[in-house]
Amino acid sequence: MKNRVFLATALRTLVLAALAVTAFAAQADWAAGLSARSPEDQVRDAGRKPAEVLDWLGIGRGMTVMDLVASGGWYTEVLSNAVGSEGVVYAQNPPMIYNFRDGFYDKAMSARLKDGRLANVVRLDRDINETGLQPGTLDAAITALNFHDIVNNPGGAQAGAGFLATVKALLKPGGVLGLIDHVGDSDKNNTELHRLDVEAALPIIEAAGFEMASSDLLRNPDDDRIAMVFNPVIRGQTDRVLYKLTKPADGG
C-alpha cells in the first residue's frame, strides 16, 4: 500500500515537473522571437519587461487575446509572438485615435501589419463596444498606459466602469485583463501628467467584479510622479501599476 502511494506521488511530481518544463520552454521560445522586432521596439523592453509581464498574466500559446487601445501596436506584436500561429490577436483602436499626431498611430499600425507580417493579428478600428465579437471570445486582454485617459476626464468614473464591463463581457470565464498604467498622486493634475490617480481608480476597478491581483514588476520608486510621462527625464521609466483582473469562473 505504501509503495502504491509513493509511486502515485512520484508519478504526479514527475507529471507536474514535465508540465512546468514544457511551459517554461514555450515561454522561452516565444520570448526569443522578440529579438526579431525593430530596434525601436526592443529599446522599450527594459522598462516594459514584456516577457515577464505576459508570463505573470498567464498569456501564452494558442490564446485569443486583445490589445485594447493598441495605438501603434507595440504590445500587439509582443502578443503576436506570445500566442503563436495557433492564437489570435485583436488589435483594437477607437477610430478617433487616428486623428492624433497627424495620423501617426494609423501609419505605425499599418507599417507593422504590412504584407501580412503578423499573420495572427486582426486589426479592429472600432470602439470597444462595437467590436462585433461575441461575448466570451477572449482568453485575455491587455490595456497598457491607457486607462488614465478614460478615467481622468469628466464622467471618468462612469466611463471607466463601462470600459471594464465591456471588456469583462468579452472575456471567457477565467479570462484575464492585464491593466498597466503610469502611477499618479491624488494631489496632482494627472490629466496634464498623463498619469493614473490610483487612489481614485481602485474603487472603479474593484467594483467591476474581477478577482484582482497586483505585481511590483513595473514599479519604480525613483519616479517622484511629478513629471509628465513624456518628459525625457522619466519617459519609459515611470512608476507603473500592473493589475491582473480575472473574470470569475462562474462568469460573475
Describe each region flagged by the PLM.
Residues S80, Q158-P173:
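A short glycine-rich, Lys/Arg-flanked "PGG" loop and its adjoining helix->strand segment in the class I
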Residues L113, N190-S215:
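Conserved Class I S-adenosyl-L-methionine
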Residues W30-L54:
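Class I SAM-dependent methyltransferase Rossmann-like catalytic core
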Residues T131-I142:
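A short acidic, Gly/Pro-enriched loop at the edge of an enzyme's catalytic core
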Residues G174-H182:
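Conserved beta-strand signature within the Rossmann-like core of class I S-adenosyl-L-methionine
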Residues R225-G252:
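Core SAM-dependent methyltransferase catalytic element
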Residues D102-T131:
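S-adenosyl-L-methionine
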Residues G62-S71:
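Conserved class I S-adenosyl-L-methionine
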